[in-house]
């Protein structure tokens, strides 16, 4: 219908790429966990009073839709590797949650997928950083090819932001995050699963690197559901 009426039709990623030119963009990529991680990042930025614009592929938790338009300088966007669309985006900083053999109708094999994530990460400007999960074997294999500042997180001992002392209270995670061995304190989630501990840790790492306090991140994580 739009084409019949001569209204331009463009892909989601291309539109996001244009929006990113006008904002300081935080881009969340990875095979799994993108929507949740994007939503937690958004919750932290809102708790910090930064009124971000948030765009996810699913529904923004607590918003009832796939987008929330804010008046602040930040755009927080889920970035999908499907059909290589995330290569149209211009992130200021990014998270890569994991890399898995998915969308093999678009990619030849896992090596092709890893190549795309390297291209994505290397689009980040010199003043940004890419936050990556050191627990993921495929992420580990691309680290040497990343030319931009890399910040690691995970349960792995070598991670800059390391999860420690994980336990579950009434089925929900309670854990400590260490930044270069120094404790940021205890964090609690209202969403279950070890995978969500990693998603939250990625969001906290990005927040700290962008100058948001651990206390603000802690409060946002505790209230996120």
Spans of model-derived segments:
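Adenine nucleotide phosphate-binding catalytic loops in nucleotide-utilizing enzymes
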Residues: 101, 107-114, 128-129, 144-225
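Phosphate-binding loop of NTP-binding sites
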Residues: 1-134, 138-149, 201, 210
């Amino acid at each position: 219908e739009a084409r019949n009426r001569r209204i331009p039709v463009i892909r989601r990623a291309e539109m996001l790429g244009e929006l990113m030119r006008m904002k300081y963009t935080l881009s969340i990529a990875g095979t799994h966990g993108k929507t949740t991680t994007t939503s937690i990042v958004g919750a932290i930025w809102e708790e910090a009073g930064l009124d971000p614009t948030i765009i996810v592929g699913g529904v923004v938790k607590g918003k009832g839709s796939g987008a929330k338009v804010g008046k602040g300088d930040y755009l927080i966007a889920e970035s999908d590797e499907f059909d290589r669309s995330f290569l149209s985006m211009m992130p200021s900083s990014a998270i890569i949650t994991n890399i898995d053999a998915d969308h093999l109708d678009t990619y030849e094999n896992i090596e092709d997928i890893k190549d795309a994530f390297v291209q994505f990460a290397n689009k980040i400007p010199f003043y940004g950083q890419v936050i990556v999960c050191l627990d993921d074997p495929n992420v580990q294999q691309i680290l040497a090819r990343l030319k931009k500042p890399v910040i690691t997180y995970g349960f792995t001992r070598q991670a800059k932001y390391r999860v420690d002392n994980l336990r579950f209270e009434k089925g929900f995670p309670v854990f400590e995050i260490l930044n270069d061995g120094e404790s940021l304190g205890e964090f609690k989630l209202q969403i279950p699963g070890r995978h969500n501990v990693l998603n939250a840790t990625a969001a906290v790492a990005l927040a700290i690197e962008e100058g948001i306090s651990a206390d603000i991140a802690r409060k946002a994580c505790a209230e996120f559901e």
